[in-house]
Amino acid sequence: MTSQHREPVTRDRIIDAALHIVDGQGLGRLTMRRLGDALEVEAMAIYHHLPRGKEELLDGLVAHVAVHPLSPAAGGEWQDRLRGWAAGYRERLLEHSGVLPLLVTRRNPAALDGTTASVQEVLRRAGLREETAATGAHTLMGYLIGHAALEARGRALSEAGGPGGAIDWDLRFTGGLDVVLAGLAQS
């Protein structure tokens, strides 16, 4: 592809290319040079869109994966809504499992705050007290991120011939989610 026909570099395109690298090769293989090669630009061109460099890139990856709010206004039973949303969030986390370590190590609270607040609002509208709804939302987010990390690790070990092949991850996920939701329903 010649430079005349190259798609312009944008922040979104940079994040998408970085996700492609992390998803395919792992977080450790993400470098600004490799990212520049993927975008067909010099690595320094990326800094025009991400002035803080790799720090801003990593924050952008976290935001892209972690931000997945639940609409508080949608209808239906709150447990069913949370089950459906949680299943989608799990898929999102597993699709980009290379970013999971960043979700717990980066100082990017805004990325998870909006999503957690949307879950909290659903719980509050379901009749839970404010503090219980806040605790429940954080517990549910912790469960989702923790389960996705364990599942990604287990699947990787299984693919490498290690233990974990006999685990029914879907059953384990829904079983754990049911425990969390049952606890919230009793609150």
State what each model feature region is:
Residues 69, 97, 101, 144, ...:
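Short amphipathic alpha-helical interaction/hinge segments
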Residues 50-51, 61-62, 137:
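DNA major-groove recognition helix of helix-turn-helix
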Residues 13, 17, 21-56:
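Helix-turn-helix
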Residues 125-128, 153-187:
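C-terminal peripheral helix-coil segments that are non-catalytic and often amphipathic
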Residues 13-20, 24-25, 56-72, 84-88, ...:
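Alpha-helical structural segments
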Residues 70-111, 130-133, 137:
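Hydrophobic alpha-helical connector segments
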